[in-house]
């Protein structure tokens, strides 16, 4: 969010070993880069074909928020009115969302690192303006 990631959170890759396949971490920071006094992210494996990411943000005043989702270079993206379809070959993931404030999505060029190489990729941006913000993204594997 706003240029800060959850990579600094302890246990980022250990969630699968936690009870009931839930990961919950909280991070607070008053730096200018973050612009957030509190950001909590929770990852839940809702079913064998669905992951839900829940974000809660609390700010002292309303601000512009941006969440980035970096995509693999082989993923094709279709932005639709109420969903986003991510396709790689015959595999398709449908992304839906619920938010307590209006959000907008856009796609931009980006980079990712695979096998020690920098590759061109794309990024999904979710933007909102709020002091208090709740977001749930549902990542559903279709086939």
Predicted regions and their residues:
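CBM-like, beta-strand-rich accessory domains located in the C-terminal region of large
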Residues: 1-143
């Amino acid at each position: 969010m706003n240029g800060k990631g959850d990579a600094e959170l302890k246990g980022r890759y250990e969630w699968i070993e936690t009870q009931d396949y839930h990961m919950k971490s909280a991070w607070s920071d008053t730096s200018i880069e973050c612009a957030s006094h509190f950001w909590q992210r929770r990852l839940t494996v809702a079913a064998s074909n669905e992951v839900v990411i829940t974000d809660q943000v609390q700010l002292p005043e309303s601000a512009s928020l941006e969440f980035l989702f970096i995509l693999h270079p082989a993923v094709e993206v279709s932005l639709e009115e109420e969903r986003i379809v991510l396709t790689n070959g015959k595999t398709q993931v449908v992304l839906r969302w619920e938010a307590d404030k209006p959000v907008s999505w856009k796609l931009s060029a980006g980079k990712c690192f695979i096998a020690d190489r920098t590759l061109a990729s794309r990024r999904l941006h979710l933007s909102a303006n709020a002091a208090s913000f709740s977001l749930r993204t549902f990542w559903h594997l279709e086939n």
